[in-house]
Amino acid sequence: VAAVYRTIPYEIRGFKDLGLPPVIASICDKPRGLVLVTGPTGSGKSTTLAAMLDKINSERHEHMLTVEDPIEYLHQHKKCVVNQREVHADTHSFSNALRAALREDPDVVLIGEMRDLETIESALRIAETGHLTFATLHTNSAAQTINRIVDVFPAHQQSQVRAQLSLVLEGIMCQSLLPKADGSGRVCAKRTVVRPSSSGVSDSTRVLDRATMPRGTRSVSCHGVL
């Protein structure tokens, strides 16, 4: 018998404790759109997302729905009504839960991981219908994230998917944990690409292909040091 254990604190750490930049707080104020937190396994994606959802939970009177595998952080009812669903315990799969999600009239939806085409399609559809949607991917840059999403789809659908992303994508946060110089622990290095008040993310996502994506993403607002 073998097992892997991960310590999850009961108390969700805030933005100040985690050292998250103000631009991430501004993303939490969005009424709708798709927000992606990316990075390798064990890079703190769940902790960042928990802080973002807790900020919304503390400030907005809305309905929050999460679909996770497994549930890591427990969100109490503050100003939001929070429903958390665990894959295999409360639902058979991410795709099944997301198909039923819109019937529950959520305002904010968390998708623990966009693993397959059906889950990615559901995330885009939920964001398109006016919900603030958070999700994770195991990618290391904004350009790689967009390519990963687009490449999941058949070739004849990829231009349509780029157009969908151009309309709903609000931000991509790429993060990793790096060792401190003094060896006392690790620090989160993060680079955030956000949609500015103009159409930066929209224009870049709509027209770029795999060859030009890295250059194009430099035209949007970038924050951080990753």
For the regions a protein language model found, what residue spans apply to each?
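Short, flexible helix-loop junctions that flank or precede catalytic/ligand sites
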Residues: 1-206, 210, 220, 225-226
